[in-house]
Amino acid sequence: IAIEDYHETNEPVVEANVVTPGFFNCHVHIMEPVGFGTDKEFTFIEKTFYTQKHLEDYINSGVTFIRVLGTENDYDMDIRDCVDAGIVKGPHMLCAGRCICMTGGHGWQGGIEADGQDECRKAARTLLKKGVDLVKIMATGGVMTKGVEPGSAQLTQEEMAVIIEEAHKAGRKTATHAQGTQGIKNALYAGIDSIEHGIFLDQ
């Protein structure tokens, strides 16, 4: 069924190619210069140009939407706004800003450390005030933070629940880094919208 009568067109026929809608990449960290596994310290300028290259690579590979789940100093929102304004070329972006983690927990170097329900609620409100599109929470440890047990539960169910409550009141979704089983369950019982990784899901 067409919305208008059929008519001839002079557009060329595309042969031996495939046309698809734009792809979504729903878990990225756009300021990671060369991926994981390096101890090199990068300057802010280096990270900025790597970010620009990553954005161009997404577009050139057909990715037209990305979900950015954790960026130091909330820089992803500045980048998002520059893309939206046409200052830099890149895909559409949903940005989480900094993650919320327990003190010394996974992602503490670039996240907001929060302990107890009051601090967690304040952290969520701070991010929402800055304009995040969603809120990222650290429910468990992770392999990229030295001295942390990747599978261990970190933020508690009660701590995550108040973060999720604040996000939902503002009309925002939530996502959690969750690898170990107990942390995954804590996040689910707290009302999380999205489990990231879920390595040790048991059902």
Roles of regions detected by a PLM:
Residues M144-Q203:
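Active-site core of metal-dependent hydrolases
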Residues A16, H27, G62, M93, ...:
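Conserved, mostly hydrophobic/aromatic
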Residues T38-K89, I112-K136, E165:
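Alpha-helical scaffold segments that flank or form the walls of functional sites
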Residues G104-A161, D193:
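Active-site gating/metal-coordination segments in enzymes
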Residues P21-G37, L94-G110, M160-A161:
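N-terminal small/glycine-rich loop or linker at the start of catalytic domains
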Residues H29-P33, V68-D76, C101-T103, G141-T145, ...:
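Active-site environment of divalent metal-dependent phosphoester hydrolases
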